[in-house]
Amino acid sequence: MDATDQGKSTSTTAAQAAPGKAAPRRGIGRDALVGGICGAVVVLMIGASYAAVPFYNWFCRATGFNGTTQVATAAPSAAPLARRIGVRFDANVAGGLPWKFEPEKTEIEVAIGEVVTVYYTVTNQSARTTMAQAAYNVTPLTSGAYFQKINCFCFTEQTMAPGETREMPVVFYVDPAITADHENDGLNTITLSYTFYPVRDAAPKPVAAGEPDKPRGSL
């Protein structure tokens, strides 16, 4: 092989080797792109999971899904119907909350469309101030969209002093529109259920707050 052929061979070898050196750079770029896409998907999924909680709560309140009751601003304008329905009251306390919680009446009968006030009694059985929030629903779940609360202790957090007992009212009515919903044909009883969950410990008050200073003995 003469010098000219050797030069051509060397040039050809170099040209063939060049793409081989560039390949790793293309691979790294492709991996970085895939990694970036995966990271973006993870971030979007995390964001969606947080957004799903308030959206789910709003959806339940708006539709009565999963037995979530509705919030009414006023009594119905029409007169109550002749049809009557039973309403049962259930009370529960989550673990770790030292409260006694029970309805004054476990069951009543009301006219559909009638505004009714009932009471639950709550006692803080501990020696410290505690706070809790009540979660609620009704069964059967199909009745949630028609159980309208005008006022309820469950709308806000409740703070109870040590040993305090309190009556907590619920003002509600069953929407007459329930009679047009065939899913609730033959419905005779609705159960309203509450469960109190601890929120956090209230800031303890100093034992000697408001008391006059006491003389100290000699050291």
From Swiss-Prot:
Localization (cell): Cell inner membrane
Its biological purpose: Exerts its effect at some terminal stage of cytochrome c oxidase synthesis, probably by being involved in the insertion of the copper B into subunit I.
Segments of skewed composition (Low complexity): 14-24
A GO CC term attached to the entry: plasma membrane
Protein topology in the membrane: Single-pass type II membrane protein
Organism: Bradyrhizobium sp. (strain ORS 278)
Family annotation (SUPFAM superfamilies): Ctag/Cox11
Periplasmic side: 53-219
PANTHER family: CYTOCHROME C OXIDASE ASSEMBLY PROTEIN COX11, MITOCHONDRIAL-RELATED, CYTOCHROME C OXIDASE ASSEMBLY PROTEIN COX11-RELATED
Protein name: Cytochrome c oxidase assembly protein CtaG
GO BP term (any one): respiratory chain complex IV assembly
Principal subcellular localisation of the protein: membrane
Encoding gene per record: ctaG
Record topological domains on the Cytoplasmic side: 1-29
Protein family: Belongs to the COX11/CtaG family.
TM region(s), chain numbering: 30-52
Record flagged with keyword Membrane: yes
Pfam family, one: CtaG_Cox11
A GO term, aspect molecular function: copper ion binding
Top-rank taxon, per record: Bacteria
Biased composition (Polar residues): 1-13
NCBIfam families listed in its UniProt record: PRK05089.1 (NF003465)
Region (Disordered), start-end ranges: 1-24
InterPro entries with a match to the protein in the record: CtaG/Cox11_dom_sf, Cyt_c_oxidase_assmbl_CtaG
Alphabetical keyword list: Cell inner membrane, Cell membrane, Copper, Membrane, Signal-anchor, Transmembrane, Transmembrane helix
